Swiss-Prot record:
A motif (Cell attachment site) lies at residues 64-66. The lineage of its organism: Eukaryota, Metazoa, Chordata, Craniata, Vertebrata. One of its GO terms (cellular component) is extracellular region. Its main location: secreted. Residues 2-83 form the Disintegrin domain. The disintegrin belongs to the long disintegrin subfamily. GO terms for molecular function: toxin activity. Monomer. It comes from Bitis arietans (African puff adder). The keyword Secreted applies. This is Disintegrin bitistatin.
Length: 83
């Protein structure tokens, strides 16, 4: 079935889905189009801060055991596994 903008479920073709325009609390997401607002790079993720990717080298996951710290790439909102 085609994606439904406004159902709070991120579906194919949508950048974001924060619900209806009346209920959306996400300034990074255009609730009417389910696309990021102008100037926004992201709306969630360990490497997203105020609609922008965190700088490359920002720690996003602290080392545990034999694993090293994980760092943001500056190009994605996801925190990659760097070990």
């Amino acid at each position: 079935s085609p994606p439904v903008c406004g159902n709070k479920i991120l579906e194919q073709g949508e950048d974001c889905d924060c619900g209806s325009p009346a209920n959306c609390q996400d300034r990074c997401c255009n609730a009417a189009t389910c696309k990021l607002t102008p100037g926004s790079q992201c709306n969630y993720g360990e490497c997203c801060d105020q609609c922008r990717f965190k700088k490359a080298g920002t720690v996003c996951r602290i080392a545990r055991g034999d694993w090293n710290d994980d760092y943001c790439t500056g190009k994605s909102s996801d925190c990659p596994w760097n070990h």
